[in-house]
Amino acid sequence: MLYGARECARLLVNEGMDAAVERHRLHGEAMASGLSSMGLELFGDQSVKMNNVVGVVIPDGINGDGARTSMLEDFGIEIGTSFGPLHGKVWRIGTMGYNARKDAVLTTLAALEQVLRIGGHRLTPGSGVHSALEVYA
């Protein structure tokens, strides 16, 4: 655990605090924009959200745990569930650390789109990735 903490500190010092905060802000914004464009409701007050995770309400008719399993088994992407009264109602999609990268955001959005479409969620194909790319432009 101490080695991991040391490595994290080393990476942060090398990148610089301001650059790390900005990187997480950018990728968090791109993820949130992409999810919204897919017709998903973002969970919570977005004016006070964190940049490193996006809460998203699981759409009606979608099996949240089944979708998470498909994301992991089919695409190698893990998204989080919620706990307590929000379990089965909200996913947590991280954009922190290694996942605070353009390719990770775009791949996650594309994979989630496929899983949702297979599950019956109606959305405009490519809308999530397109919206995220506009944030990056």
Language-model region placement:
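Flexible, glycine/charged-enriched surface loops at secondary-structure junctions
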Residues: 16-23, 39-46, 82-84, 119-130
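PLP-dependent enzyme catalytic core of the Aspartate aminotransferase-like
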Residues: 85, 89-137
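Conserved PLP-binding catalytic core of the aspartate aminotransferase-like
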Residues: 41-74
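Structural signature of PLP-dependent enzymes
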Residues: 1-29
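Short glycine-rich or small-residue beta-strand-to-loop segments that form or flank ligand, phosphate
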Residues: 12, 53-55, 92-97
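Short gly/pro-enriched beta-turn/loop segments at secondary-structure junctions
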Residues: 28-30, 35-38, 47-51
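A common structural junction motif
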Residues: 72-79, 113-116
